[in-house]
Swiss-Prot record:
Keyword Transcription regulation: yes
Protein name: Transcription factor RFX3
Keyword Transcription included in the entry's annotation: yes
Species in which this protein is naturally found: Homo sapiens (Human)
Description of how the protein assembles with itself and partners: Heterodimer; heterodimerizes with RFX1 and RFX2, and RFX6.
Length: 749
């Protein structure tokens, strides 16, 4: 396959049709064997062509006229994907015309000289002659300036060649060789070549054994599997990573595809636990041990352990870092708006605080990008001058030089004084919201994109530890600053938990939406639902327009019938949200209206699920799964839409009710609530319901999930509450972050 440089004769483009194992893997031409004398003549003629591109094959017909450069009528065979032939050192190339086809002539193209005396410079090419024809396999030109540094993926023809190779070298039976095609296809479906990454050989083989076990296939041994890998992903290199006595062989240049189900295996959990140890950076903190009042650093086995961890997991970390968005940077922090300085401080102290906190946030972003979550606690301890009153083990983790530098720039006494000022509190809260939003977008850049289970679990464990780490590090800081900081980090942790759960639901629902039989069953069950009855029951609570509800029902069924992808469903949900909130755009009541929309959406979908349950729908499980996904994704959309409307970050929106004082009845925005209530009254007046029905006694107070027991007792009689919600009534809680994050409220009627 070669294109003439001059391009004087534009050849027709013909798609190369690859064959299955029993067919020839060459274009439909009459390929004849070429005598040795004619081979040399053809080699010299080919050398006059100035460009031989990497991994190209030129077919030379024995009966055709050999054209000189510029006179060749070129026919190209474009591949639909990267399917390339390249040299494999020490390997053989076989023609796939039949099992008896053997390579009869292999002529190296190193340092070949053309008829004009021009050095060809083809690196690593070979001229192969078999019973079916002559093939010129080249890698690159020396004067091209580009060397072949990437591994190449085999074409379907190479799959057949690999099967024949294994059959001849290992003496595989016909039955076993017929199974190799499925094994090789599985490799192509789940792995891909990439620079700078590697996988342990044992991990690949364990994936393969699991695949064989699930599909009841007979696996080949490890040695034969290694040949399979190299025959498909040609040019792979092997590296031994790890310390002496604890190293393992890795395939370098291959990784699991991002959308492969192998990413969801739990076997990498142990690796991710190790991954959270310090590595790939200079050690910012050294463990210090106090012995007779003298702090001596560990210089023995502790450093060796760190080195072992670093060398063992450095290659694996690159695989998980590809799912992050490391291009994100911290937003610009605003200036501190302060009218009067606290006693004992100067403007230079405020500037020092701004500079130190910026560096502190950049360090946090740095360790998150490298998945070194455990270092966050040490960063907080250093910035807030953590000093445990009673060390339990006689050991404290700190870095004296770093602390002394920070102390010289801003003494702790002045830091504590500044933390009491309201302007500093507000400024630091805004900085935290911007930083945490950037961290969320780094760790989970796309909530619908598949994420490995190991990375998901590591993020959830990280979120679970955040509040405890921060509270412990700020043990000597004023309480008002602690509340402000904890409220922001709580919103960050809750967002990480929600987004990882949403991502997990998305991957589970993706399989359902791609299953034709399940979609047909869902359509059949959905057509049996009495939507008129559902609307009649939901109208009293939701107050939704009948035409809009009917339109949503029709659109939902149509989208389901079209077997839309998950991304198309996401676009549909976004359009529904935009249409529902459009009347409230630009109004102060927009956030409240958005929360009301979430409640109505959840209530209406629960009514549909109830109808499916009562009818014992066969597809109830599928509907329940996508209902959970759509509710979570709608929450995600509303959260971002409210943030856009208010000019804040989603983290700031979620942190609005992070403080108990902020959600107390006395501190709620009464004006906003009154405006929404007046709008709801107008909707009630315009409705067609009888006046008597609308005048029924109502309890207008809604109680969040997990609200305080005393508030319930004073607000409404417990007997009026639905017993099914009693599990959400808890005694005094520290925060109601769960309530504000999920947006779930219940109205006692």
């Amino acid at each position: 396959m070669q294109t003439s440089e001059t391009g004087s004769d534009t050849g027709s483009t013909v798609t190369l049709q690859t064959s299955v194992a029993s067919q020839a893997a060459v274009p439909t031409q009459v390929v004849q064997q070429v005598p040795v004398q004619q081979q040399v003549q053809q080699v010299q003629t080919v050398q006059q062509v100035q460009h031989v591109y990497p991994a190209q094959v030129q077919y030379v017909e024995g009966s055709d006229t050999v054209y000189t450069n510029g006179a060749i009528r070129t026919t190209t065979y474009p591949y639909t994907e990267t399917q390339m032939y390249s040299q494999n050192t020490g390997g053989n190339y076989f023609d796939t015309q039949g099992s008896s086809a053997q390579v009869t002539t292999v002529v190296s193209s190193h340092s070949m000289v053309g008829t004009g005396g021009i050095q060809m410079g083809v690196t690593g090419g070979q001229l192969i002659s078999s019973s079916g024809g002559t093939y010129l396999i080249g890698n690159s030109m020396e004067n091209s300036g580009h060397s072949v540094t990437h591994t190449t993926r085999a074409s379907p023809a190479t799959i057949e060649m690999a099967i024949e190779t294994l059959q001849k070298s290992d003496g595989l039976s016909t039955h076993r060789s017929s199974l190799l095609n499925s094994h090789l296809q599985w490799l192509l479906d789940n792995y891909e070549t990439a620079e700078g990454v590697s996988l342990p050989r044992s991990t690949l083989y364990n994936h393969y054994l699991r695949h064989c076990q699930e599909h009841k296939l007979d696996p080949v041994n490890a040695a034969s599997f290694g040949k399979l890998i190299r025959s498909i992903f040609m040019g792979l290199r092997t590296r031994r990573l790890g310390t002496r006595g604890n190293s393992k062989y890795h395939y370098y240049g291959i990784r699991v595809k991002p959308d492969s189900p192998l990413n969801r295996l739990q076997e990498d959990m142990q690796y991710m636990a190790m991954r959270q140890q310090p590595m790939q950076q200079k050690q910012r903190y050294k463990p210090m041990q106090k012995v007779d009042g003298v702090a001596d650093g560990f210089t023995g086995s502790g450093q060796q352990t760190g080195t072992s961890v670093e060398q063992t997991v450095i290659a694996q970390s690159q695989h998980h870092q590809q799912f992050l968005d490391a291009s994100r940077a911290l937003p610009e922090f605003g200036e501190v708006e302060i009218s009067s300085l606290p006693d004992g401080t100067t403007f230079e102290d405020i500037k020092s605080l701004q500079s130190l906190y910026r560096e502190h946030c950049e360090a946090i972003l740095d360790v998150v990008v490298n998945l070194q979550f455990s270092l966050i606690e040490k960063l907080w301890q250093t910035f807030w001058r953590y000093s445990p009153s009673t060390p339990t083990d006689g050991t404290t983790i700190t870095e004296s030089s770093n602390l002394s530098e920070i102390e010289s720039r801003l003494p702790k006494a002045k830091l504590i004084t500044l933390c009491k000022h309201e302007s500093i509190l507000k400024w630091m809260c805004n900085c935290d919201h911007g930083m945490y939003q950037a961290l969320v977008e780094i760790l989970i850049p796309d909530v619908l994109r598949p994420i490995p289970s190991a990375l998901t679990q590591a993020i959830r464990n990280f979120a679970k530890s955040l509040e405890g780490w921060l509270s412990n590090a700020m043990n000597n800081i004023p309480q008002r600053m602690i509340q402000t900081k904890v409220a922001a980090v709580s919103a960050f942790a809750q967002t990480l938990r929600r987004y990882t759960s949403l991502n997990h639901l998305a991957q589970a629902a993706r399989a359902v939406l791609q299953n034709t039989s399940q979609i047909n069953q869902m359509l059949s069950d959905l057509n049996r639902v009495d939507f008129a009855n559902v609307q009649e029951q939901a109208s009293w609570v939701c107050q939704c327009d009948d035409n809009m509800v009917q339109r949503l029902e029709t659109d939902f069924k149509m989208t389901l019938q079209q077997q839309s992808t998950l991304e198309q469903w996401a676009a549909w949900l976004d359009n529904v949200m935009m249409q529902a909130l459009k009347p409230y755009e630009g109004r102060p009541s927009f956030p409240k209206a958005a929360r009301q929309f979430l409640l109505k959406w959840s209530f209406y979908s629960s009514m549909v699920i109830r109808d499916l349950t009562l009818r014992s729908a066969a597809s109830f499980g599928s509907f329940h799964l996508i209902r959970l996904l759509y509710d979570e994704y709608m929450f995600y959309l509303v959260e971002h839409r409210v943030a856009q409307a208010t000019g804040e970050t989603p983290i700031a929106v979620m942190g609005e009710f992070g403080d108990l004082n902020a959600v107390s009845p006395g501190n709620l925005d009464k004006d906003e609530g009154s405006e929404v209530e007046s709008e709801m009254d107008e909707e009630l007046d315009d409705s067609s319901e009888p006046q008597a029905k609308r005048e029924k006694t109502e309890l207008s107070q809604a109680f969040p999930v997990g609200c305080m027991q005393p508030v319930l007792e004073t607000g409404v009689q417990p007997s009026l509450l639905n017993p099914i919600h009693s599990e959400h009534i808890v005694t005094s809680t520290q925060t109601i972050r769960q309530c504000s994050a999920t947006g779930n409220t219940y109205t006692a009627v």
